[in-house]
């Protein structure tokens, strides 16, 4: 599976009663662009009254989804980690960039969540960047476990 970033454009009623076209970003776990479009359309239908358009779909480079599980975690952060390895052929340190999508309440919490997540890893790493994204939510792929044994 791969995460796709989908942009949804729709008309939202603002607090002052006026309507305004807005675009929101969501992540969808899917196998292809076509599946990502179908899934985001299905996921958004219950939440948006009226028409909406899927205006963008792009692949992301996230290798892991890291969540802290707290109800207060309502923001998504992009973490760039540098995995540090030793190349025995050249006798030099090598750094490889790896990207995580992290759900947390704020940037300090996101840092803590990444550190906690990496405690079980044997890889040396550095957190190179940690930035808040405009992503509203993530829709994971769910396997249908119900069977129909007639």
Identify the function of each model-found stretch.
Residues 11-27, 46-49, 92-100, 122, ...:
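A cross-kingdom feature marking solvent-exposed beta-strand/loop segments within repeated
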Residues 66-72, 139-150:
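Short, low-order "capping/linker" segments at domain edges
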Residues 1-21, 72-95:
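Short aromatic-glycine-(Arg/Gly/Cys) micro-motifs in beta-strand/loop hairpins
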Residues 11, 31, 80-85, 103, ...:
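Extracellular/lumenal glycan-associated surfaces
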Residues 2-8, 24-27, 36, 40, ...:
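Short, structured motif recognition centered on aromatic/hydrophobic residues
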Residues 99-139:
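Mixed-charge, glycine-accented linear interaction segment located at domain edges/termini
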Residues 57-68, 132-140:
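Short amphipathic beta-strand and strand-loop transition segments with alternating hydrophobic
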Residues 29-64:
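Short, well-structured hydrophobic secondary-structure segments
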């Amino acid at each position: 599976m791969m995460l796709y970033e989908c942009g949804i454009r729709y008309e939202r009623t603002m607090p002052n009663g006026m309507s305004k076209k807005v675009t929101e970003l969501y992540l969808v776990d899917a196998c292809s662009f076509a599946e990502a479009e179908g899934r985001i359309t299905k996921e958004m239908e219950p939440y948006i009254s009226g028409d909406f358009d899927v205006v963008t779909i792009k692949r992301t480079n996230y290798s892991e989804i890291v969540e802290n599980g707290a109800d207060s975690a309502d923001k998504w952060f992009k973490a760039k980690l540098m995995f540090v390895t030793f190349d025995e052929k050249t006798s030099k340190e090598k750094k490889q960039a790896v990207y995580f999508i992290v759900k947390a309440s704020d940037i300090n919490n996101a840092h803590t969540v990444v550190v906690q997540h990496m405690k079980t890893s044997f890889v040396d790493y550095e957190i190179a960047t940690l930035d808040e994204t405009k992503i509203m939510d993530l829709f994971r792929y769910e396997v249908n476990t119900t069977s129909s044994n007639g």
